[in-house]
Structure formats: structure tokens, C-alpha cells
UniProtKB/Swiss-Prot annotation:
Highest taxon in the source lineage: Bacteria
GO BP, sorted A to Z: cytoplasmic translational termination
Annotated protein name in UniProt: Ribosome-recycling factor
SUPFAM superfamilies membership: Ribosome recycling factor, RRF (SSF55194)
Species annotation: Cupriavidus pinatubonensis (strain JMP 134 / LMG 1197)
InterPro entries named among the record's database cross-references: Ribosome_recyc_fac, Ribosome_recyc_fac_dom, RRF_sf
GO cellular component terms, semicolon-separated: cytosol
Record HAMAP family: RRF
Gene that specifies this protein: frr
Keyword terms of this UniProt record: Cytoplasm, Protein biosynthesis
Subcellular location: Cytoplasm
Protein's UniProt keywords contain Cytoplasm: yes
Stated family: Belongs to the RRF family.
Gene3D superfamilies in the record: 3.30.1360.40, Ribosome-recycling factor (1.10.132.20)
Amino acid sequence: MSVAETKKSVEQKMQKSIEAFKADLAKVRTGRAHVGLLDHVQVDYYGSMVPISQVANIGLGDARTITVQPWEKKMVGAVEKAIRDCDLGLNPATMGEVIRVPMPPLTEERRKELTKVVKGEAEGAKIAVRNLRRDANEQFKKLVKDKAISEDDERRGQDDVQKLTDKYVAEIDKMVAEKEKEIMTV
């Protein structure tokens, strides 16, 4: 594997770490409703667990309400139960065939708790990015040892990977700041 291939591989893996972090952030409930909040909810559909998006249409009623409309009338109860049982503290209300999920306002204590959760998730994402940097640097050392590249190429490769690491860590920090602002906004 060459320096360029190693850098490209590392960048792709770092991008995947960022995507995973974005998905984790989307699960953190803020005071505002958004359809991504229910993405991880699993519904018992005739004996098998499937994502809620496969059995219902999810939309926004207003800024603080998610509307869920199951495609089959008899699934209303199962979908409502799945939303109630997910660990988001939501209390869905069924109105005919439509389930309305109001977002309860967050207490100050809960906001601070969520901020800590976000920071913890961010630290995990940063560690993943740094581990990828370490793996790339080990790969460069191995290439030098095998005489596939020069020490100058190794140094350049390490510098480039460090720049990528800095870029992705800064992106994580930016995402955390935005999410904290969103959480703390009353």
C-alpha cells in the first residue's frame, strides 16, 4: 500500500467516523421535533423487529410535534407502544389513525445532562479519529521498514494524516458546539 492509498483509506475511515457521530447526535433529543429522532425506534411487525420508517410515515406537525401515520390501521397500537418504550421519554397520543408525539420541554438539569452526553459522544468520535491516525502512522513505519517508501515520504504522509486528523477533530468540535447551542436554547 502506498502513501497516497493509505491517506485515502484513512480519510474515508475518518469520514465514516464523522457520519457515525452525526447519527449519534441526531438521537440526542432537544426541545425541537425532528423526524430523525425516531430513526432508531424498532416496531414489532408480525413477529420481527423493523425500523419505524418501514411501517409508518413520519412527519412534523409543528416545531414541537412529530406525526406518525402507520400504513396499516392495525399497526397503530404497536407503533405507539414502540415510541412509548423507546428511551426518549416521549408520550405519544393516538388520534384515529395518526399518532401525535409532542416534545416535552427540557428541564435545565436535563439540558446539562444532554450536553454531557454530547461531549462524551464527541470524545468517542475523536478517539476513533486519533486511532485511525495511529494506524496510518504504523502503516507508514511498516512501509519504511519494508523499504517501500523513503523516510521523507513517511514524514510527509504523517504530516498529511495529522492535517486530516486536525480537520476532522475541528469538525467534531464544531458539531458539538452547534448541538450544545441547540440543546441549551429554551
